[in-house]
Structure formats: C-alpha cells, structure tokens
C-alpha cells in the first residue's frame, strides 16, 4: 500500500487569513502537508520528516520588538524554505537583511517584474506579458535589503524586493500571495517549490486516502463495533460511506430525525444509506420531542442549546442499546484539529470553525474514530464522490446543525417547519433548474413570524412572509449577496405563494456579511 505521508510539507502559521488556503493548494498538487503554529515545539521539526517548510503570512510587523520569528531549527534543517509575505519578511530579518514599514499598505492586484530566473520563476509568464506577472498583494512592511547570499528575483513599481532567493540554500521568498487565485501563476510557483525543489511525489489523491484510511480503521477497531451519528450532512455521510467500506456491518449509524431537516431529507438519507448502500441505520423519529422542548422558546442561543442537548440525549439512549459498540465515529475535519491545537503564546492565529455536534456524555467511554481529521472540506467532498455518493449530496450547500430551528425566527412550531421546508425545497429546485445552484455558495429560505396583507382571488388574506437568502463567498467569513436575476426571483416567489397555503409575501435578502451574518439567527 502507498504511504501517502512519506513526502510532506510543513507550514508554519504566523497568523495569516490565507494559511489554510496554502495548505489546500499544496494538497491539490497531490502532496500532504500540516499546519503548525509558528511557536510549536521546534524540537519536533526534525522528527516530522518534512521535505520542505513554508512560512506563512501574518498580521504582525517584523519592525516591532517581539514579532514572531521562525525557529532556528528551520534554517539548521537543511530543508528548502519558502517564505510568503510576512514569511519572507522574517526570513530576511532573521538572516541578516532588513525590513521597513511602507508609507502606505499595499492591498489588491499588482504586477511584478521578474528580474532573475530561479527555480521558481524561470520561464514563467502570464497575461501581464513577458517577465511580468499578475499577483495579489496584502502587506504593510516590505524587505528593503536582502540577506547575504540572496538575489532579488522580482520587483514592483512600489517595492524593491517582491521576491528573493538563495538557490544554494534552497531558500525562497515572495512578498505576494501565490495561494490566492488572483496570482495567476501562483499554483505553478507552489508546485515548483513542492515538487521540483523539495522533490515531493504527488501521492495525496482521493483513491490513496481512502485506501489508507480503510487500513487504519481496520487496524484501530479490529472486530469491535462502531456507532456514528448520521446527520445527512457531508462530513457524517462521507464517514458512513468510508467506514461501511472498511468494516461493513460492524458499523451502526444513528439518524435522529428532528423534524427540522430539509424537505424529505430523512427519507432521502434512509434511501441512500440503508437501501442503496446497505448501511445499518437506526432512524429515530424524534420530531415530537423536539417541538415539545422548543415550545415557547424564542431566543436563538436557547434554541441551539435545546436542539444540541436533545440530540446528545437521544444518541446516548440509542448507543446504550448497542452493547457491543466500543468506538464512536465522528466527522472531525482538519480545521477542527487546527483550532484545538492553538498557540503557546497566543500570538499565532487560532482558526475558528463550527462543529457539527456538541460534546457527547463522558460516561459513554467509547474510543474515537475520526477518519477525516486530516482533511479539509473540499477534500472530504472529493472523497465522497470517489466513494460513490451522489454529487448532489456531496456538494450541497451548508446546513446549520440546529437545522430549520434557526431559520424559523422566534418560536419553532411544527407547521412553521413544514411550511419552511417546502419553501426552501422550491427555492433550491428552481436554482438547480436555472443552473444557478453551483454559482451560489449558500441559498435557503427563512420563515418570518409576521403576517402581511395580501389578496388571494378576490379575498383579503393575512398570511406569513418567507425570506429568501443567497450568498457568494470563498471562505464564509465575508459574503456578498447573490445578484440573482429578477425573472428568476419572480418565478420562485410565484411558486411559493401559489403552492404553499399560508404564505402571501416573499422577500429577498440583499445584505452582505458584514454587517449581516449569513444565517438570520
């Protein structure tokens, strides 16, 4: 079996918003990599066995006392080093060069002139012309003098050192961000460093990852049984498919139907996993319990806690019926691992993420199986397709853990949930028919607990309002509202009002994030 972790890259994170993007780009090349905080125990660098080290960008200034620095072990390792933005600045400052604060921050598109061909830049061109490249800048400081042994490889009209290298040491730096798509040749630069300079083989593929994880799971659990909380979301669905392939009927999935899922989602989950794939799934119809617990509750955080705690309670009840289960499978993904690792000094960037499931009871005493813990979300999706899950399931828009409970403003009632689920299904159906679903990052309907005057036939109606929300985003930290065609919105509105009894008005949310959040609650 191929060892997919043999060739790997270590990324030291100095707090950049793009650090995870660097890792994702390297994984896309086909090479495994890990992100460590810049102040991670440096004695572990040699033992990690990386083929090369990348120093990320960051918000600090190398011109100020106490700025984060790369451990000396990085330079003593003999490994290739690639500094990006702040990473290049600290590379210069630590190796005898100089940095200075710019008169004005540089953010956005820029063009760099390649003035010396090294292993990264040789023969590289794009639409900007020969020896001139389109890049993306985001910096306040810049390198004013390169260290001894370094050559300036690129400049701009505003800064003297846009890139530098010491070919003998295999140390490289760029002031711009190759991981961002606006840098047109960025992926080529990263590939040249990872594959050509570091000599990594491209072994990190979906097929190899599946083979590796199947072997790991079988070795970990042996003949024991495993339970999994199956939500119908991407992560738990991929875990279910992967574990079923690895251990067959030793996997039992518990699917809690809360009554707050997408339209007919419970039936779809059962059809896909229980009927089509042959996975052992216990379906718990818990809608009555959820609506009873949520009666009279209007505060969003209170609703979230009730929904989460009740899931844990029901999952605990079902797991107690499975006496032979020794392992709990979870859909933990790599951003969760990065967040929990944190930083010793608190200066390194801590990446926040939303967890699908809250803490499970300590008395369960089950071992953890986390086959996705090395993967980013886009990698999880690719695994899902490789495992045979439908693309429509794997590439669905995000859905909040509390489900429709936070898309019904105020008190949650069964009739509200049924109305909203149907309205949402109409919106999504029309997006797919118009080939707009994949151009939006997230789209959904919201139930507003207010009534509006309308006219149905010749009679006055006083009925509910449905809001539609669609956004475009790269990272979900910021988002633009999707500029859907007016004719399309009219079609959706007409269908909702005509097909759903009790709705007299449909509105479209044109708020960006910030100031609004993507979800309404």
UniProtKB/Swiss-Prot annotation:
EC numbers, comma separated: 6.3.5.2
Catalytic residues in the record: 85, 177, 179
Limits of the Glutamine amidotransferase type-1 domain: 8-203
UniProt organism field: Xanthomonas axonopodis pv. citri (strain 306)
Segment forming the signal sequence: none
Quaternary data: Homodimer.
Pathway named in the protein's UniProt entry: Purine metabolism; GMP biosynthesis; GMP from XMP (L-Gln route): step 1/1
SUPFAM superfamilies from the UniProt entry: Adenine nucleotide alpha hydrolases-like, Class I glutamine amidotransferase-like, GMP synthetase C-terminal dimerisation domain
NCBIfam families: guaA_Cterm, guaA_Nterm, PRK00074.1
Domain named GMPS ATP-PPase: residues: 204-396
GO cellular component: cytosol
Protein name, entry field: GMP synthase [glutamine-hydrolyzing]
Catalysed reactions, semicolon-separated: XMP + L-glutamine + ATP + H2O = GMP + L-glutamate + AMP + diphosphate + 2 H(+)
Function: Catalyzes the synthesis of GMP from XMP.
HAMAP family associated with the record: GMP_synthase
Domain of life: Bacteria
Gene Ontology molecular function terms on file: ATP binding; GMP synthase activity
CDD domains xref list: GATase1_GMP_Synthase (cd01742), GMP_synthase_C (cd01997)
Keyword entries, A-Z: ATP-binding, Glutamine amidotransferase, GMP biosynthesis, Ligase, Nucleotide-binding, Purine biosynthesis
Annotated ATP binding sites: 231-237
One family name in Pfam for this protein: GATase
């Amino acid at each position: 079996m191929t060892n997919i972790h043999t060739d790997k890259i270590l990324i030291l994170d100095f707090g950049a918003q793009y650090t995870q993007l660097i890792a994702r780009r390297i994984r896309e090349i086909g090479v495994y990599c890990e992100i460590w905080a810049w102040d991670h125990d440096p004695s572990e660098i040699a033992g990690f066995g990386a083929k090369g080290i990348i120093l990320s960008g960051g918000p600090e200034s190398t011109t100020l006392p106490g700025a984060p620095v790369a451990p000396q072990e990085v330079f003593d390792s003999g490994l290739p080093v690639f500094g990006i933005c702040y990473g290049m600045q600290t590379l210069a400052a630590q190796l005898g060069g100089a940095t200075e604060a710019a008169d004005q921050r540089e953010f956005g598109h820029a063009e760099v002139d390649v003035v010396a061909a090294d292993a990264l830049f040789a023969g590289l061109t794009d639409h900007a012309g020969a020896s001139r490249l389109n890049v993306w800048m985001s910096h306040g400081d810049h390198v004013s003098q390169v260290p001894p042994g370094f050559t300036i490889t690129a400049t701009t009209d505003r800064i003297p050192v846009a890139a530098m290298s010491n070919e003998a040491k295999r140390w490289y730096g760029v002031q711009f961000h190759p991981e961002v798509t606006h840098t047109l040749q960025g992926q080529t630069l990263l590939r040249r460093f990872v594959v050509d300079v570091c000599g990594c083989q491209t072994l990190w593929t979906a097929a190899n990852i599946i083979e590796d994880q199947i072997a790991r799971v079988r070795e970990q659990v042996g003949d024991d049984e495993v339970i999994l909380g199956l939500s119908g979301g991407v992560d738990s669905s991929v875990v279910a498919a992967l574990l079923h392939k690895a251990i067959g009927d030793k996997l039992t999935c518990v699917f809690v139907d809360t009554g707050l899922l997408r339209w007919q989602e419970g039936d779809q989950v059962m059809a896909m996993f229980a009927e089509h794939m042959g996975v052992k799934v216990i379906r718990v119809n818990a809608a009555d319990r959820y609506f009873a617990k949520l009666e009279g509750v209007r505060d969003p955080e209170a609703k979230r806690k009730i929904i989460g705690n009740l899931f844990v309670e029901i999952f605990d009840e079902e797991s107690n019926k499975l006496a032979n289960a020794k392992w709990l499978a979870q859909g933990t993904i790599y951003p969760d691992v990065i967040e929990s690792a944190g930083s010793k000094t608190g200066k390194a960037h801590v990446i926040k993420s939303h967890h699908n499931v809250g803490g499970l009871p300590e008395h369960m005493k089950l071992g953890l199986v986390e086959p996705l813990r090395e993967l980013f979300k886009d990698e999880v999706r690719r695994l899902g397709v490789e495992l045979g899950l439908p693309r429509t399931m794997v590439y669905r828009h995000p859905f909040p853990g509390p489900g429709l409970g936070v898309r019904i403003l105020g008190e949650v009632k069964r009739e509200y949930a049924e109305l909203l689920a149907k309205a949402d299904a109409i919106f999504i159906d029309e997006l797919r028919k118009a080939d707009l679903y994949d151009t939006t990052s997230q789209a959904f309907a919201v139930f507003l607990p207010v009534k509006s005057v309308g006219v149905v036939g010749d009679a006055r109606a006083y009925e509910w309002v449905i809001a539609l929300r669609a956004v475009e985003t790269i990272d979900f930290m910021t988002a633009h509202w999707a500029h859907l065609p007016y004719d399309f919105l009219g079609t959706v509105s007409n269908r909702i009002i005509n097909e759903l009894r009790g709705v007299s008005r449909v509105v479209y949310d044109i708020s960006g994030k910030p100031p609004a959040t993507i979800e309404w609650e």
